[in-house]
């Protein structure tokens, strides 16, 4: 296995020599900007990368092909490059405090910085936006607090509202309420005239609804009566039973909808068949349960019903017969069984 001249495996040096060199001032550069290894031939082009240092170029080598700048993620803003003959330097001194808001380029930084210190109280309430995510805010370097991924932070609005609570200023409280509830901001701005107009519209709408309901119910009741009257007139007008039934139907239609104690609905019935019509349909059903289209048309003309009404009546009658036969069969089976 072969190593190049610049690899640390080919360079043979002891740890004691490093320690003795660290105790002396030979490992520090002339500008004292950061910790750099000496450009000696023993060290080659590699420094102590575990300590977060930058590689340096030896005096003998003009430029190395595989050499790249190894930037530690906690050393920010390494942008200044010098000539390849010299070592890389950073203008920022070592003793300066590293800001907490600086990350590498591939890490997504949060635009808002979480500030809980007293400096937040110095901000004016008008400068605090209602939606904190849209406006980026600069993170101060001297603030040691760490940004937290915030969906809603109470300190962003409560800090300003707390300072203005003692000043008794109504504008500050309104801005705080707008920040807490931005959707309901347009409601207090309604004028008194608009409120009166809305009340009038609601009253007029509530007054028109019962009249419409009564108008809708009355045509249905009126529409049901002429059909029954025409059917009864064709069958027999002189019979007293038909007259009594007609008078009862008129009384039912004239009376308003009954209360909840009686189980009667005020709407028109779904199958308004007279006694004569039901008798004729029952006779035909006893003769034949299933009708052809020609026979159904003849019956509908004789009974003064539509083709669809006769068809539906026969379907319902067949379902009723099926249900009755099932009940009778169950009753017979249970009667034959003896329980011990």
Curated annotation (Swiss-Prot):
The keyword Nucleus applies. It comes from the Eukaryota. Residues 266-325 bind DNA. GO terms for cellular component: cytoplasmic ribonucleoprotein granule; cytosol; nucleoplasm. CDD domains: homeodomain (cd00086). Residues 242-253 have a biased composition (Basic and acidic residues). It is found in: Nucleus. Its main location: nucleus. Residues 185-268 are annotated as: Disordered. One of its GO terms (molecular function) is DNA-binding transcription activator activity, RNA polymerase II-specific. Residues 203-217 have a biased composition (Polar residues). The modification Phosphoserine is found at residues 238-239. Keywords: Developmental protein, DNA-binding, Homeobox, Nucleus, Phosphoprotein, Transcription, Transcription regulation. Pfam families: Homeodomain. One of its GO terms (biological process) is spinal cord motor neuron cell fate specification. Gene3D superfamilies: Homeodomain-like. Sequence-specific transcription factor which is part of a developmental regulatory system that provides cells with specific positional identities on the anterior-posterior axis. Belongs to the Abd-B homeobox family. This is Homeobox protein Hox-D10. It comes from Mus musculus. The lineage of its organism: Eukaryota, Metazoa, Chordata, Craniata, Vertebrata.
């Amino acid at each position: 296995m072969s190593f190049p001249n610049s690899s640390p495996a080919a360079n043979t040096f002891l740890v004691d020599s490093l320690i003795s060199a660290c105790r002396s001032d030979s490992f520090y550069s002339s500008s004292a900007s950061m910790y750099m290894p000496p450009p000696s031939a023993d060290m080659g082009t590699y420094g102590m990368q575990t300590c977060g240092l930058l590689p340096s170029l030896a005096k003998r080598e003009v430029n190395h092909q595989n050499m790249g700048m190894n930037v530690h993620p906690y050393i920010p803003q390494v942008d200044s490059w010098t000539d390849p003959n010299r070592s890389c330097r950073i203008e920022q001194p070592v003793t300066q405090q590293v800001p907490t808001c600086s990350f590498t380029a591939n890490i997504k930084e949060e635009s808002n910085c979480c500030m809980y210190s007293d400096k937040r109280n110095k901000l004016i309430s008008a400068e605090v936006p209602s939606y904190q995510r849209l406006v980026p805010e600069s993170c101060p370097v001297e603030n040691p607090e760490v940004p937290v991924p915030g969906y809603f932070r109470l300190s962003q609005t409560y800090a300003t509202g707390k300072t203005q609570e003692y000043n008794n200023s109504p504008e500050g409280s309104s801005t705080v309420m707008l920040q807490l509830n931005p959707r309901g901001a347009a409601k207090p701005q309604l004028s008194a005239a608009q409120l009166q107009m809305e009340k009038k519209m609601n009253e007029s709408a509530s007054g028109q609804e019962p009249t419409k309901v009564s108008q809708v119910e009355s045509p249905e009741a009126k529409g049901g009566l002429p059909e029954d009257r025409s059917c009864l007139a064709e069958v027999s007008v002189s019979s007293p039973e038909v007259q009594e039934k007609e008078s009862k139907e008129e009384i039912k239609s004239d009376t308003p909808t009954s209360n909840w104690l009686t189980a009667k609905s005020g709407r028109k019935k779904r199958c308004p068949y007279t006694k004569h019509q039901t008798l004729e349909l029952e006779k035909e059903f006893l003769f034949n349960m299933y009708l052809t289209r020609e026979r159904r048309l003849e019956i509908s003309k004789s009974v003064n019903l539509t083709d669809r009404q006769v068809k539906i009546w026969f379907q319902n009658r067949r379902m009723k017969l099926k249900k009755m036969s099932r009940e009778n069969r169950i009753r017979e089976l249970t009667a034959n069984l003896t329980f011990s």
